[in-house]
Design a protein with these regions (language model features):
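Short amphipathic, positively biased membrane-proximal segments
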Residues: 1-243
């Protein structure tokens, strides 16, 4: 939607559409694949998505910096969103991790030379912090006009801290971390409902969807918290079984 609003001015703007679509297909295929080994095509798709996310972040940063004023609040608010390509990077990274785990033994799997639960937990914690930064920027632009707008900048940071602690500390049962990650998952769905309500309250509401989907709060943004929190729950489960 953002690139459509930008009229696909640069041919590179088609890249995330292709990459995200392929990642979605790869994810559906991987979910149905019962073979316990890495699928090299899926793995390549996920790695390409991560690379596209890195390149997209560079393009968006350039878009911000080339405007008058450079790295100013006005440009951060209204130029290409810096946090958007990172979502593609995270989805690619998590997909690649899932593929790598297929080659690991069921008992004590390893990632990047460390226990899989620790590695995945740290990755998700970093992803949560980055997503919080993007939400904080957008809600600051909206002047936090509704009290609920403070939720995505207060709940997920706690989840990230708890998950990072679980990843780095001695493995054990962590019921409070699990509970907080579930709250963060619910927060993402609740945020999508709030954003849908925000679109409905604009002039013309959903009858004027072709304009309000672009001008209103972004519908796909809040579920990113749900996706990361679910990945965090998987990491926590892995971590609790490690020695």
């Amino acid at each position: 939607m953002e690139h459509y609003r930008g009229s696909f001015d640069n041919p590179a703007m088609y890249t995330p559409l292709v990459s995200a679509s392929l990642s979605l297909i790869a994810g559906l295929h991987g979910g149905a694949d019962r073979r316990q080994q890495t699928h090299h095509v899926r793995h390549a798709i996920y790695r390409s998505a991560a690379a596209a996310g890195i390149a997209g972040t560079g393009f968006h940063f350039y878009n911000v910096m080339k405007r008058p004023g450079g790295c100013s609040w006005n440009n951060l608010f209204h130029a290409a969103p810096l946090g958007a390509p990172i979502a593609l990077l995270l989805s690619g990274a998590l997909g690649a991790v899932a593929e790598r785990l297929r080659d690991e033994p069921a008992h004590e799997p390893q990632l990047l030379g460390m226990p899989a639960g620790r590695a995945l937990g740290l990755l998700v914690a970093v992803g949560l912090i980055g997503t919080v930064g993007e939400a904080a920027l957008l809600h600051f632009r909206g002047s936090f006009q509704h009290r609920a707008m403070y939720a995505p900048v207060s709940v997920p940071p706690v989840a990230a801290a708890l998950l990072a602690h679980a990843a780095l500390a001695v493995p054990r049962e962590r019921w409070f971390t699990r509970l907080w990650l579930r709250i963060t998952t619910a927060l993402g769905f609740a945020g999508a409902a709030f954003h849908a309500r925000g679109i409905a309250r604009r002039q013309g509401g959903w009858h004027n969807w072709s304009q309000n989907l672009f001008a209103g709060p972004p519908l796909p943004a809040p579920p990113s918290f749900s996706a990361l929190a679910l990945a965090g729950l998987a990491a926590l489960r892995l971590r609790e079984t490690e020695k």
